Amino acid sequence: MKKKIATMMFVLGLCVSTVLGGCGKKDADSSAESANTESGDSADDSQGDGSTFSNLNTFSCETMDGGMFTQDDFANKDLTVMNFWMTTCAPCVQEMPKLEEIRGTLPDNVQMVLVCLDADTEEEAAKEIIGRTGYTGLVTKSGDGDMEKVNSQILYVPTTLLFDAEGNRVGSTIVGSSPDLEGVYTEAINTALSEMDKEEWKK
């Protein structure tokens, strides 16, 4: 009996932690938060997120300020950190002020880009969230080409992927948010830079 109760408490604990971590993409589409990923989990391509992710060698995205972001914009940096989010995902919105802090301390060879997956239909909501949370970095809409493939492969938001100067996937996948977002991002960025024989991010 004690063993059964302990098992139930463990499962309940996992459920509570996942509610804080992120939203299922389907549930976010219907404006419902759900328990889908353990808070702060990092995963390889085939772990934790249920899918693999394509490279971004050929794509284009409209930015929220009316510009364009393409694969050519990767070439200016050694590493691009892309955070995929939705307007209906509370953890996505809650982490944006911290993402702004992290973005402001990144080294010159690393850039951060936020991709709003539902901005095509929720542009005004996306702009309101960006303004309210104080995020001043680049935010794009969902895009086409290889970006469309990646968007379809994302099961949970927020999901963060890292790409090299040629648009190839590097490092690990960050699925969900985390109370120690800065620590999670620092580890992921330094792992990717190390894989590419680049100097690690010194904080």
In which residue ranges do the predicted regions lie?
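Bacterial N-terminal signal peptides that target proteins for export
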Residues: M1-M9
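A short beta-strand-turn-helix
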Residues: T58-T80, G104
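Aromatic-flanked redox-active Cys/Sec active sites in thiol-based oxidoreductases
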Residues: N83-C89, L117
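Structural microenvironment flanking redox-active thiols in thiol-disulfide oxidoreductases
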Residues: V93-R132, D144-K149
